[in-house]
Amino acid sequence: MTAPWRRLRSLVWEYWAGLLVCAFWIPDSRGMPHVIRIGGIFEYADGPNAQVMNAEEHAFRFSANIINRNRTLLPNTTLTYDIQRIHFHDSFEATKKACDQLALGVVAIFGPSQGSCTNAVQSICNALEVPHIQLRWKHHPLDNKDTFYVNLYPDYASLSHAILDLVQYLKWRSATVVYDDSTGLIRLQELIMAPSRYNIRLKIRQLPIDSDDSRPLLKEMKRGREFRIIFDCSHTMAAQILKQAMAMGMMTEYYHFIFTTLDLYALDLEPYRYSGVNLTGFRILNVDNPHVSAIVEKWSMERLQAAPRSESGLLDGVMMTDAALLYDAVHIVSVCYQRAPQMTVNSLQCHRHKAWRFGGRFMNFIKEAQWEGLTGRIVFNKTSGLRTDFDLDIISLKEDGLEKVGVWSPADGLNITEVAKGRGPNVTDSLTNRSLIVTTVLEEPFVMFRKSDRTLYGNDRFEGYCIDLLKELAHILGFSYEIRLVEDGKYGAQDDKGQWNGMVKELIDHKADLAVAPLTITHVREKAIDFSKPFMTLGVSILYRKPNGTNPSVFSFLNPLSPDIWMYVLLAYLGVSCVLFVIARFSPYEWYDAHPCNPGSEVVENNFTLLNSFWFGMGSLMQQGSELMPKALSTRIIGGIWWFFTLIIISSYTANLAAFLTVERMESPIDSADDLAKQTKIEYGAVKDGATMTFFKKSKISTFEKMWAFMSSKPSALVKNNEEGIQRALTADYALLMESTTIEYVTQRNCNLTQIGGLIDSKGYGIGTPMGSPYRDKITIAILQLQEEDKLHIMKEKWWRGSGCPEEENKEASALGIQKIGGIFIVLAAGLVLSVLVAVGEFVYKLRKTAEREQRSFCSTVADEIRFSLTCQRRVKHKPQPPMMVKTDAVINMHTFNDRRLPGKDSMACSTSLAPVFP
């Protein structure tokens, strides 16, 4: 019996122990009321916001029901609620409703959302120390001493910083900020102060007050080409703006809209998915969490069973941010109340000003709470009660709908996901199946009308280099296009008022998506439009008519050496001859015995008289012998150096003479831009409003400034297009400044034109796109691909290679005409005439001396001499009677200039060395 008894005693002990545990548990459970009451004050309206107000009230009930069904959160406790409705901005009614709820013993009051009503309720809650839960943004002054509130809406200082980080990531340099009411300027302070710290230009605009029609403002922004716009407005206004922007043609890929509302995901964006517009927003609802997705799905099922929605632009059954925040707020209050045992709630009277004794303790529990709710991580600032730590999803509109492309948090900043990294969150993904408008201008060989016997339409009307380039780009990127000629036929330039024309204007006005033409990439144009990488490099040069060949002169044989060289050669000849004469007189080795057969001869002679010295130099220069040979070392040095000098001169002359006489020289009056600037006889200019004109207009180089002053002073210097300039260059004394590629094409087909000089500058042709176009990078990549495949070079060879000008005849083997070497015959004739004149002089002089010596008349002597000279067969004639030879001092002195006596001898010479004395 002992064992059964012990077993019975054990069972009794367990029974009493269980009763004891229950006795201790019952007081704790009784410390928490069986019913917890919360209060909600919501505005109601009859307009488009009525559905939103109903959604907030529904979210309040929805969250309470979820908590009551989840018995693990509040065991043995039922969460009840009291809902009061007030009119918008009726703060008196809000105060009365709040006092009514406090009299019921609520532990917290949720709402209202409007500013004046919120302030009224917050004052009462702060006085009676009852937590006030706020769900909308509210401006809290720095001196605000109210502490009994928390706000689940993200702090707008942090949200403004998120917008600024996104703007910096997108590399915006200018943007327009559009706000709904004056509080928007407060909310966006961080962004508005950005220009003082960052290189961003902001334009601030306000939406119309008391009107949903934003079309006048949109029209003004469209006219001002404001493509990057930040809208700070409600989701209702955002839906209206998108609809009106669509009607005004602003929902294109060139516009980028950022909406600050956290309900962008709740809007019906189906009509805009394929528009190409860049639409970016923020979302705090954590849809990536499976638990959140389940709650949102349950919410949608209940909302879809309600009455059909009005035309507010919202998706059916979507849970908006306010509803999600309210859901999280109710859960936070419930969790905090569970963690605050032994807390009782009393009925509070507003007129008694007696605070809830557990209010401060409960408020601290709420501010210290950390909760992972529908809107992500919830943490409050313990001092301000604001939600400063949260995660924001960056969402962007794609063809498949809104997609998450990044995350922002106050701690980590902006983090763009790998899918979108490197291309911005809202760039159009592909050009496939897109139809683009292409503007161009007629310019050979880039764009030309196709010659055909039949009528052509559309893109088939055109051909040329740019047309082939456009076809290749369309093949690579998969887009279709429509070619349109620019209305004014101009490339694009700014006037004095800063207004653009031509293709640039059409890109600015978004009348075209691409400008495919020989459009030069310039600094000024880059400020108005975007360019792809250049598909062709070039420079400015001069187109001028080909100069005619110069008429050869009869003295063309003098051309191989310049006049300066001829003068220097003449001076060298005279100088060397004189120096040779002087040195030969001083050198003893140049004197020789003229009569070596006579040992007693005392006279020596010197061959290098002044005339002989000149004759020696002339013979060497003409490469002919003079029969005068220097004997002394000094004179031989002079002779050798002179021979070397004449060798180089004659060889150079001979080599250059062939080129000058056999090749026709083409002399142009200008050889460079400097030559143009220095003269005014030849008129010069460029295409009006073209890149070349802009280059000279903006240039700071003195030569180009001088040229622009000339062109601007003469309106006729600027031509309308290249065709007009080419015709003027052919028919008038006119030089056209244009791109080297066009000059190359023109000179291949017109042999009367040529390029003068080299390139004045270096630049490139690029494909133009509107500013901020998503197509630019894709076009650039395709151009680089064509360049690597050598297709750009092949296309250029196709369109630039012409029949070409006929090759000039080979002048090396051509016969020389009299017009080139006739001067040689003139020199020969002149030499003959001169020799005849000298011979006549010698003849007359000699006969006069003979007549005097023979004592005959001069005429008879001349007649006899002429008669003898005309007798060509006779080679011998009688020598005149020799004079009597005498030795005199006069004779000796007469020969001392060329002869000198041998030292130590008497002054006696052979009879043959003595000068004759004529009586």
UniProtKB/Swiss-Prot annotation:
Keywords: Cell membrane, Disulfide bond, Glycoprotein, Ion channel, Ion transport, Isopeptide bond, Ligand-gated ion channel, Membrane, Phosphoprotein, Postsynaptic cell membrane, Receptor, Signal, Synapse, Transmembrane, Transmembrane helix, Transport, Ubl conjugation
GO molecular function: adenylate cyclase inhibiting G protein-coupled glutamate receptor activity; glutamate receptor activity; glutamate-gated calcium ion channel activity; glutamate-gated receptor activity; kainate selective glutamate receptor activity; ligand-gated monoatomic ion channel activity involved in regulation of presynaptic membrane potential; transmitter-gated monoatomic ion channel activity involved in regulation of postsynaptic membrane potential
Residues bearing the modification Phosphoserine: S869
Family annotation (Pfam families): ANF_receptor, Lig_chan, Lig_chan-Glu_bd
Extracellular side: 32-563, 658-820
Binding sites annotated in the UniProt record for L-glutamate: P518, T520, R525, A691, T692, E739
Classification via SUPFAM superfamilies: Periplasmic binding protein-like I, Periplasmic binding protein-like II
Superkingdom of this protein's organism: Eukaryota
Protein topology in the membrane: Multi-pass membrane protein
Chaperone as UniProt keyword: no
Glycosylation sites per record: N70, N76, N278, N381, N415, N426, N433, N548, N551, N752
Summary of subunit composition and partner proteins: Homotetramer, and heterotetramer with either GRIK4 or GRIK5. Can form functional heteromeric receptors with GRIK2. Interacts with PRKCABP. Interacts with NETO2.
PANTHER family named among the record's database cross-references: IONOTROPIC GLUTAMATE RECEPTOR (PTHR18966)
Described purpose of this protein according to its UniProt entry: Ionotropic glutamate receptor that functions as a cation-permeable ligand-gated ion channel, gated by L-glutamate and the glutamatergic agonist kainic acid. Binding of the excitatory neurotransmitter L-glutamate induces a conformation change, leading to the opening of the cation channel, and thereby converts the chemical signal to an electrical impulse. The receptor then desensitizes rapidly and enters a transient inactive state, characterized by the presence of bound agonist.
Family membership noted in the UniProt record: Belongs to the glutamate-gated ion channel (TC 1.A.10.1) family. GRIK3 subfamily.
Protein name: Glutamate receptor ionotropic, kainate 3
